[in-house]
Regions:
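Regulatory sensory and allosteric helical modules in signal-transduction proteins
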Residues: 44-98
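Short loop/turn motifs at secondary-structure junctions and domain boundaries
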Residues: 34, 97-103
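Juxtadomain coupling helices with adjacent low-complexity linkers
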Residues: 3-7, 11, 120, 125-156
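Short hydrophobic/aromatic beta-strand element in the GNAT-like acyltransferase core
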Residues: 39, 107, 121
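Amphipathic alpha-helical regulatory segments at dimerization interfaces
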Residues: 9-17, 25-34, 76, 146, ...
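A short, aliphatic-rich beta-strand micro-motif
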Residues: 104-114
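Helix-loop-beta substructure at the N-terminus of cytosolic sensory domains
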Residues: 16-53
Length: 156
């Protein structure tokens, strides 16, 4: 599945009558399949916390479904407003272990286009080192730009 198909799928999910969590799960699965990634999750960001709202079924719920906004790779993405790509999480002290099998991770902030505030994150994980290329990062940043609608609808 190509990234244009994924973007259309995200837009379709956002326009559907599904609830926010159901939309997040559907979108996470679309992204996971497009890049052959092992796990994808979507998180809401508040002033204090990062909170999981939906993820792919396998390997399951994240070990940290909510954590302080200043922690982990997600905290770094929120603080900078930029994607964080780590191709060996065992070498990065910011990494919060969600799954023992994760070796590479990308966190992409979802930004409110009106205020520039980070309102969510797209978390993509792989069981392989060096799994993410710049093309992956660019595609995921494109997905995050469309994802704003998931958070706008919730009043985030």
């Amino acid at each position: 599945m190509g990234w244009e198909t994924v973007l259309r799928g995200i837009e379709d999910a956002l326009a559907s009558d599904l609830g926010r969590a159901e939309k997040a799960v559907q979108i996470a699965e679309l992204v996971r399949q497009a890049g052959s990634y092992r796990w994808v999750g979507l998180y809401a960001v508040t002033d204090q916390e990062i909170i999981a709202i939906g993820w792919t079924a396998r390997p399951g719920a994240p070990a940290h479904p909510r954590f302080p906004v200043t922690q982990g790779l997600s905290g770094a993405a929120v603080a900078t407003g930029r994607a964080v790509v780590v191709n060996d999480v065992t070498a990065d002290p910011r990494y919060l272990t969600a799954f023992a099998s994760t070796l590479s991770e990308v966190i992409v902030p979802v930004v409110d286009p009106g205020t520039g505030t980070v309102v969510g994150t797209l978390d993509v994980e792989s069981a392989e080192r060096d799994a993410f290329t710049d093309a992956d990062r660019q595609a995921l940043v494109g997905c995050a730009a469309v994802l704003w609608g998931l958070f706008a609808a919730a009043g985030s």
